[in-house]
Design a protein with these regions (language model features):
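A short hydrophobic beta-strand element
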Residues: 76-86
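Short beta-strand segments enriched in hydrophobic/aromatic residues
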Residues: 27, 86-88, 102, 118
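Short, cysteine-centered beta-strand-loop-beta hairpins and adjacent loop/turn segments enriched
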Residues: 88-96
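Short, aromatic-enriched amphipathic alpha-helices that serve as compact interaction elements
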Residues: 1-19
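A solvent-exposed, acidic/Ser-Thr-rich amphipathic alpha-helical stretch
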Residues: 5, 20, 24-72
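Hydrophobic/aromatic beta-strand elements that line small-molecule binding cavities or substrate pockets
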Residues: 68-73, 85, 99-104
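Short beta-strand edge/turn micro-motifs at domain boundaries
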Residues: 99-118
């Protein structure tokens, strides 16, 4: 797949809330995921299975998702980024709006890294 195809497919799946499908389909086995140092309860991990498990961990912290939007991807070289806005209720933390930018690196037709900024 080209970077354009990967970026568009990942965006499509994220808009549908199918994050795990995106990871299983588009990520390299040795992909990395980097969270900001201030991320509540989430850590940076290496490996597709660890990324999927981190997604499960995040979902276990969510009481309800009220709405979410994901921007069209912006592509530059081997990287693409998307912005997301999620209106959600976190367990024990109440309702909040989470805004983030995600930057993805692609190599050999797979996502090899993701990094989140929020």
């Amino acid at each position: 797949m080209t970077i354009e195809q990967i970026a568009n497919r990942l965006t499509e799946l994220c808009r549908q809330g199918q994050y795990e499908t995106a990871q299983k389909e588009l990520y390299a086995d040795n992909a990395t995921s980097t969270e900001p140092e201030h991320a509540p309860g989430l850590q940076s991990v290496s490996g597709k299975n660890a990324i999927i498990e981190k997604g499960h961990q995040f979902q276990s912290m969510v009481e309800a998702v009220h709405s979410s939007t994901v921007s069209d991807p912006i592509i530059a070289g081997n990287y693409f980024s998307v912005a997301a806005v999620i209106d959600l209720t976190m367990k024990g933390m109440g309702r909040m709006t989470m805004t983030e930018v995600a930057v993805y690196k692609v190599a050999d037709g797979k996502v090899v890294s993701e990094e989140f900024f929020y």
